[in-house]
Swiss-Prot record:
Molecular function terms from GO: RNA binding
Protein name listed in UniProt: Maturation protein A
GO terms (BP aspect): viral genome circularization; virion attachment to host cell pilus
Known partners and oligomeric status: Interacts with the host pilus.
GO CC, one annotated term: virion component
Location in or out of the cell: Virion
UniProt function note: The maturation protein is required for the typical attachment of the phage to the side of the bacterial F-pili. Binds to sequences located toward each end of the genome, hence circularizing it. The RNA genome-maturation protein A complex is released from the capsid upon host receptor binding. Maturation protein A enters the cell along with the viral RNA.
UniProt keyword annotation of RNA-binding present: yes
Length: 393
């Protein structure tokens, strides 16, 4: 995305106007045209409150509109003046102010509001709640099993030490017992090295269990206050077209609009959060999964995701969040034909926009209805795989 100059800038465009008479006389009335080529409404930033352990996010808005290129075109006509024939070539004389070009895009005049498509907005809110559920599952499982994990770690570590001590003393039967292997096992070699290699089949699983238990305990070692974060960004290409009255012209705009939602939350009830992540607290989701061929509906209209989002906040407390809307795009303005003139090349202007607005959200977002694009290749392959899986069950 091109970076625009954040301050205003004036530019100059040369408008040709030359009349050539039949007797060879030239009359040049060309002139420069000054226009505002860059405009920015300025930056808006607010400072979020700060506590001992948390700095709340702040709102801000930035944007700029720039006229990338202005071509006055080429027009020609034949005529007479006081009985003298002439051929005249001229430019359109199009004058554009970057401040008025906001109307070419789905934004407000001061660029602090972006018209995000409803489908994008609903998908972002629904899927970010799904991210919250995934976070609940990962941390909820860890918290719920932390106590048993600690006990398991100590038991396995003691078993490892005892097995190691027995092996060093040559008491292989006792070592096998600690490693939960068959103590009546007969070795093919009497050498200590061969016996040790055969015991690897018992050592390795035990060491793996100890490492896994240790990692789980270190991951769930939480501070008194530790917010988690869920993020989802969704974008869509948008095309617009319309008419202008001054100058008399048509325009076509293409832009990309995206919404990024960030939620900071913390789990205040690990058991409820875990149950919510498993879908146990949402009977509607369970019933929907049992509906025959519901996955075909989910392919286009993800009802399952929307139902899942209804119970995502259970067991969690909302801390803060932001909604960031971004637009970047380009518009082409094409002037209408001029009456009485032949259009050799129409006058055109290319306008670019780049704007971002972030607002602070103080409550949980709510799910909404959205439609997935059925033309995505990955989406289509996923649906075919699901269809085959369900059909051959």
């Amino acid at each position: 995305m091109r970076k625009f100059i954040p301050t205003e800038r004036m530019s100059k465009s040369h408008v040709v106007s030359v009349r050539e008479y039949a007797d060879g006389e030239l009359e040049d009335n060309s002139l420069p045209l000054i226009y505002r080529s860059n405009w920015s409404p300025g930056q808006y930033t607010s400072t979020g409150p700060r506590t001992k352990e948390w700095h709340y996010p702040s709102s801000y808005s930035r944007g700029a509109i720039g006229i990338k290129a202005l071509d006055q075109g080429k027009y020609a006509r034949l005529g007479t003046s006081w009985g003298r024939e002439f051929e005249e070539r001229a430019g359109y004389g199009m004058s554009i102010d970057a401040r008025s070009c906001y109307s070419l895009f789905p934004v407000s005049q001061n660029l602090t509001w972006i018209d995000v498509p409803t489908n994008v907005a609903n998908r972002a809110t629904t899927e970010v709640l799904g991210k919250v559920t995934q976070g609940n599952f990962n941390l909820g499982v860890a918290l719920a099993e932390a106590r048993s994990t600690a006990s398991q770690l100590s038991t396995q570590t003691i078993a490892l030490i005892k097995a190691y001590t027995a092996a060093r003393r040559g008491n292989w039967r006792q070592a096998l017992r600690y490693l939960a292997l068959n103590e009546n096992r007969k070795f093919n070699s009497k050498s200590v090295a061969s016996r040790w290699l055969e015991l690897q089949f018992g050592w390795m699983p035990l060491l793996s269990d100890i490492q896994g238990a240790y990692e789980m305990l270190t991951k769930v070692h939480l501070k008194a206050f530790m917010p988690m974060r869920a993020v989802r960004q969704v974008g869509q290409n948008v095309s617009l077209s319309g008419r202008l009255t001054s100058p008399a012209a048509s325009y076509k705009s293409t832009c990309n609009i995206s919404r990024r939602i960030v939620i900071w939350f913390y789990i205040n009830d690990a058991r409820l959060a875990w149950l919510s992540s498993l879908g146990i607290l949402n009977p509607l989701g369970i019933v929907w999964e049992k509906v025959p061929f519901s996955f075909l509906v989910d392919w286009l209209l993800p009802v399952g995701n929307m139902l899942e989002g209804l119970t995502a906040p259970i067991g969690c407390s909302y801390q803060s969040g932001t909604v960031t809307d971004v637009i970047s795009g380009e518009s082409t303005i094409t002037a209408d034909d001029i009456y009485g003139w032949d259009t050799v090349r129409p006058a055109t202007a290319k306008v670019q926009i780049s704007a971002v607005h972030r607002g602070v959200q103080s409550v949980w977002p709510t799910t909404g209805v959205y439609v997935k694009s059925p033309f995505s290749m990955v989406h289509t392959l996923d649906a075919l795989a699901l269809f085959r899986q369900r059909l051959w069950k």
